Amino acid sequence: MISNFSRLQNIYNILFILFISLPGGLIYLLTGSTLSFWLRESGFDKITIGLFSLVNFIHIFKFLWGPLLEKISFIPSNSRGYKYCLIFSLLSCICCVYILTGFNPTTNFISFSLCLIILAFFSSIYDMLLQSSQMLLINNKNWGISEAACTSGFRIGILISGSGALYLSTIISWQEVYRTMAILCVPSLLLIIFYPLKFKEKIAVNDFDRFWHAFYDFIKKPKWLIIVGFMLLYRLQDNFLAVMPNMFYLDIGYTKKDLALGYKAFGMCATIAGGFIGGFLCRKYEYTYIFKRVLVYHALSSITFLLLYSYSQTITTLYIAVFLQEFTKGLTMSPFFSYQLRCCSSKYCITQIALITSIAYISTVLFGSISGYAATYLGWGYFFAIASFCFIPAYILIRYLPRV
């Protein structure tokens, strides 16, 4: 009876994680890919659009406020403080998105940029809480499934703020599009308020020295430097491409409606499918076995950019290219995020997850910010050729990764 109740509670918690992941995906694109379309229509060039990736630099430093967030979240240890933090961070994100719509990116450049940075700050807090929710609510053996659910919820959010926002922008202004996205986050906020959160185990409340304890606990792990290097390099290909595929598809003649349906909507479905398959693979195979294969598959998918650039640019070839790119991206993501959880200790979950994801975000910000320069000065052909080889550094590190 207890076992059945525990299993049912796990299912409810996994569904809860799926639904609260949705605003994370919604907000993610509002400072990234969707923003690039708004900036493009406002007259910004590829270099400037690429540099806007720097607004997400705040994610690099989230490990600094991780201990404070952990302290607040676990007072009291019955999950009430954790729920308050979820509510506050998501509500702040919604308000920031709404305020952002009051600025014009060309005439209010500074205010617009500052609002984006503040949005990225609260988004980073929400992301930390979201990722740690799996460790706090879900049994270890179900982390692969919960990560697939988290990724799927996140991707559905991206689908809405990607495909949905792009399609809406052909009907209404970008300011109205962003207001719509803010409103769509409200149901998840209400779910967080009314859902009866319960941790799978009692969390001890520690002092502010817990950052050093969390850091020391992490560096005691075998081959921790290899883990750090792997986190930094694993998504190098996607980080190098950044938002440039948006510009590429527009440059070779596709319309926003083509991209809303073919690239964003269909591509997101392919990513979700790949994410679920990747999550189930985590239950069957060892992580290094999965990483070796999915990295190569995803690298090969970059060749489709070159084929589109050199040959046919039909709707059919767009769908084929997008499926191969996004499905393999989904395959790479679930095992990676699940592995991140395995590298953390439950008692330091927020701080250590913040530390690991901060390391991963260095690559996102650094290579995303130079992608515009690379695409402009190398040309699309060389740009995508280089992207297809970006998997090599992470692939070399796989053989040295510790088993977790």
Curated annotation (Swiss-Prot):
> What are this entry's molecular-function GO terms?
transmembrane transporter activity
Indicate yes or no for the key word Acyltransferase: no
Could you list the residue ranges that cross the membrane? 11-31, 49-69, 84-104, 109-129, 154-174, 177-197, 224-244, 261-281, 294-311, 315-337, 353-373, 378-398
**Presence of keyword Transcription:** no
Localization in the cell = Cell inner membrane
Q: Which InterPro entries match?
A: AmpG_permease/AT-1 (IPR004752), MFS (IPR011701), MFS_trans_sf (IPR036259)
Q: Which Pfam families match?
A: MFS_1 (PF07690)
The membrane-topology field of this record reads: Multi-pass membrane protein
GO cellular component terms, alphabetically, are: plasma membrane
Q: Which UniProt keywords apply?
A: Cell inner membrane, Cell membrane, Membrane, Transmembrane, Transmembrane helix, Transport
The lineage's top-level taxon is: Bacteria
**Family listed:** Belongs to the major facilitator superfamily.
The name this protein carries in UniProt is: Putative transporter AmpG 2
In its UniProt entry, the species of origin is given as Rickettsia bellii (strain RML369-C)
